[in-house]
Amino acid sequence: MRTRIGSAGIWGAMIAMFLVELARGAIANDAELLRLGALPDNGQIHHEYWRLITCAFLHWDLRHLLLNTLLLFLLGPIVERRAGTMVLLIIFLSASVASGAGILIKHEIWPAEGVSLGASGGMFGFLGAALVLVFRRPSPGRLRILLIAALILGLIYSFLPNVSMIGHIVGLIIGTTLAFVVPLKESEPTVVDA
């Protein structure tokens, strides 16, 4: 599965922000991550709405970054190949912003310990979109099974401590919903070696 331009762009932005985190000593540092754009634990962003986007490009540590970039590498091309680069970017940004908003609402009601950040809302958006898109356009049965397995594992993972279930669920709902309404990209021709 080759990487597409939109997937590569998101990947590049996540890596660039992680390098900024390293340079600023922000790895696992709530105060510095807040300065870079993470979501606060009390749900109060004081009209700093840009945090709904920046939080998606920040990661707590290298493990967190690697998990989200692996998901991007696996799911991004599935969505991008079937729906196009613009749809991929719309799904990522919409799922990430909605996920961040869901987290803020939850934190307003039940304050959390520590900042919220990461691209998992966007990745769950891709997972929901990929599931819909592989059923909208005929795809290999094993890809469908793998995506369903990924959904089950992702939902189980959402129950772990310090993982934002609300962020994952909101991202999944947004990605799934958008994938039902976006136009499918025309199939790419298959190259057959003679």
Protein language model regions, located:
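A detector for small-residue-rich transmembrane helices and their helix-helix packing motifs
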Residues: 1-194
